[in-house]
Amino acid sequence: MVSGHDDAVDITLRAYETAAQRYADRTGGPGPASCAFLDRFADTIGRVRVLESGSGTGKDATYLEGRGLHVSRTDAALAFVEMMCAAGHDARVLDIRTDDLGGPWEAVLALAVLLHLDRAQFADALRRIREAVVDGGVFAFTLKEGDGDAWSEAKLDLPRHFTYWREPSLRPVLAQTRWDVISIDYVDGLEPWLFVMARAA
């Protein structure tokens, strides 16, 4: 049972800490839409250093490394960091809400990460990432498309919180946090997604 006194992101993070292996077992590598998005991201940024927030099992980082990019893998869940380190990768714990992002970075990647933040936390994360990126740097991320927010126990059998977005409400937040939209693509899957790429203004 989810307590109203607990932060939704912290509850979600505990779910990942508890069931990281279950997540890995139930999640494959990047699908065709994600691969196409990662390819476009790589083509846009060239061979630069990429900060990845929410690396999870590291599958997206591995794909980009195959394209010749250097990816700094991070995750707020220690269980995922330990999993990546055990596989021979450098990785560190980083909470996008509070931790120093380092930099300046030429590019940042956050696939299926920011969708766990509420709207105020999301805007704050965009500001923090902008401060850690060089002018003209590129930020790529994905969100679930829709209205409102909801809890789900899908995939992990534990509660995770999701905030849904639509393009008309997303664009002003990007502009207010000094990001110029490169592209916002609608991707249909089991659920509709928004694949977003923006450039630091």
Annotated model-derived regions:
Residues 1-51, 56-103, 120-124, 128, ...:
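Class I (Rossmann-like) S-adenosyl-L-methionine-dependent methyltransferase catalytic domain
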